[in-house]
């Protein structure tokens, strides 16, 4: 496959927020009564659901799983309405220059490491670990005790290889900073089935670093908008089976009138610190795979999801790229540590 596929970004615009699909591996979850259950998660941010190993559809309330009481047909009829509402209620992303991150040269992106009031980073020195995760120019990553060396290369190396050296993004990391609210405030699932305040997380993170960051350095075309603000948040992400009050990783947009050094925030992305949930690797925290950041960052470049994006397709005939593209399930190859190409 030609590595010049990044040039596709020139012709694409973002129509809505884009999110990683659910991790399709068996997930072990400890329920409040101490029992464990192994489930599969399906779908994406717009609507996700769980099944047992024998295919029974399960309700999830907190970490308690029970079989649905309605028929499968009734469940998915309701699910389609919820998903459709989630897609339709979004404001279309503008097709102007601020909608897409530059995709040639070495543009800079601002990355903010954020903790919650009730959840801190498990990685002892997250800035050190994520600096090599994002920016290491060659060779293996150094091991600091959180499986960093499992990641193949770095995000920057990945895009350099995919573009034959034409695109080598730079990631300026600040933080960690502590958000003003608990995790549930930002990640708690609404009645519509998705995160409540992801964009607010981005704005709050910007407020916390505004005195130490010159945001004008991140507007490459001087159009008045920061090219990208990316947040890596402490803990686990909902797409990999963590609790419903965690944030689902995604690329999104921010509707805010706030200005920093004369620049507005618009394009944003977020993803989690760690792989899986509290039971993954016997509870030993492990840094998230490169694939997750690469997938969401690719949305910021203008690339769409390649997985089945309609509920009917994902239920009955999921004939997507699967493991053959990082914009589908290739995001999670070898836990995302060795993601596939486009």
Each PLM stretch: what is its role?
Residues 18-269:
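Zymogen propeptides/activation segments of proteases
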Residues 8, 148-149, 316:
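Alpha-helical interaction segments
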Residues 6, 203-207, 291-299:
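A broad, structural surface signal
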Residues 228-230, 234-342:
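Extracellular hydrolytic enzyme modules, especially secreted metalloproteases
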């Amino acid at each position: 496959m030609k590595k010049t596929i990044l040039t596709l970004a020139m012709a694409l615009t973002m129509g809505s927020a884009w999110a990683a699909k659910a991790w399709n591996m068996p997930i072990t979850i400890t329920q409040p009564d101490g029992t464990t259950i192994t489930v599969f998660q399906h779908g994406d941010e717009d609507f996700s659901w769980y099944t047992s190993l024998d295919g029974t559809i399960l309700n999830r309330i907190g970490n308690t799983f029970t079989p649905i009481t309605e028929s499968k047909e009734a469940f998915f009829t309701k699910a389609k309405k919820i998903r459709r509402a989630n897609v339709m209620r979004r404001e279309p992303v503008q097709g102007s220059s601020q909608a897409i991150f530059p995709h040639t040269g070495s543009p800079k992106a601002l990355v903010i490491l954020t903790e919650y009031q009730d959840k801190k980073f498990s990685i002892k020195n997250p800035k050190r670990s994520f600096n090599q995760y994002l920016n290491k120019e060659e060779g293996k990553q150094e091991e600091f005790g959180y499986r960093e060396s499992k990641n193949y290369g770095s995000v920057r190396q990945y895009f350099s290889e995919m573009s034959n050296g034409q695109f080598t993004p730079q990631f300026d990391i600040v933080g960690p900073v502590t958000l003003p609210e608990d995790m549930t405030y930002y990640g708690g699932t609404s009645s519509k089935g998705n995160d409540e305040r992801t964009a607010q997380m981005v704005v709050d993170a910007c407020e916390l670093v505004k005195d130490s960051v010159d945001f004008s350095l991140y507007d490459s075309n001087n159009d008045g908008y920061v090219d990208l603000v990316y947040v890596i948040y402490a803990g686990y992400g909902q797409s990999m089976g963590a609790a419903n009050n965690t944030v689902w990783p995604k690329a999104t947009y921010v509707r805010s009138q706030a200005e920093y050094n004369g620049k507005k925030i618009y394009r944003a992305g977020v993803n989690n610190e760690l792989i899986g949930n509290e039971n993954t690797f016997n509870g030993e925290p492990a840094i998230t795979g490169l694939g997750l950041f690469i997938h969401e960052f690719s949305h910021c470049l203008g690339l769409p999801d390649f997985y089945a994006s309609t509920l009917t397709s994902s239920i009955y005939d999921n004939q997507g790229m699967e493991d053959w593209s990082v914009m589908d399930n290739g995001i999670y190859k070898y836990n995302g540590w060795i993601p596939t190409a486009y």
